[in-house]
Amino acid sequence: KIDPRAKNPDSLKWVYKYNYIKNHYWDNFNFARAGLIRTPVFQEKLNTYFKNMILQMPDSLIGPMIQLIEKAKKNTEVNHYIFLYLLNESNQSQIMGMDKDFVLLSEKYVLQDPKTWLDTAVVSKIRERVNAIKPNLIGNIAPELKLQDSEGNYYSLRQMNAKFTLLYFWEPDCSHCQKTTPILYKDLYQVLKSKGIEIYAVLTQNNKEKWMKAIQEYNIQAWTNVWDPNYSSNFRKLYDVTSTPIIYILDKNKRIVAKRLDVDSSLKFLQAQPEMK
């Protein structure tokens, strides 16, 4: 019941109505009827619930995901459909951090289930994907990298002394890197360096000559520019580096707080942090 003395009763009514609809959204759905999953109505119902009713944040979505999968156990076909829908959505989502939900769903319902119903090849692909992203999930301490500069001096990622460290994977021949690197330097590093931002820039290839030329061209000598000429650090696997450029943002404790953002989004993210005020 809404207190009539509330300062904004209309807003409270809206919140109450929203929570009621969200909490009772599946009350009259018969999970035992497998035929429903072959109708466009069911797909639309799933989309509406998970994309409009639930706050679009990984921690807000995972609970309702698991609840719905459990409810759907009344019918194997319905259960499998919903699980695959949610697994694919979490894997393909553009929401930062949804890979965490993909890992949680994969481990709970596939990798930790000795009687999984999925094909062996599918399970193998899921395991491979989990192994690729689990080390670099948001909230994790960033896997250590100790890489060398052009003169052979080694620099530790975890020993970077900064409020925030941008871990930047790039290569001189990458067309996107050629656009991103100067923007990263001018629009982010130059703007925030006085507030405690450092960049640990990792060359992903092994052409030293092109690398040195690019460092000079982009005027990024102030960055910690490192490479792994023998590919001995396993950085590609640790950080799921399959393309470039890639940006990870680490806090002062080297915990991953954001990942795979463009320069503009990285700048906005950092400027919103209390430490940068």
What do the PLM-derived regions correspond to, one by one?
Residues 139, 160-161, 192-195, 217-219, ...:
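A structural signal for short secondary-structure junctions
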Residues 153-185, 198-200:
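Short active-site neighborhood of thiol/selenol oxidoreductases, capturing the structured segment around
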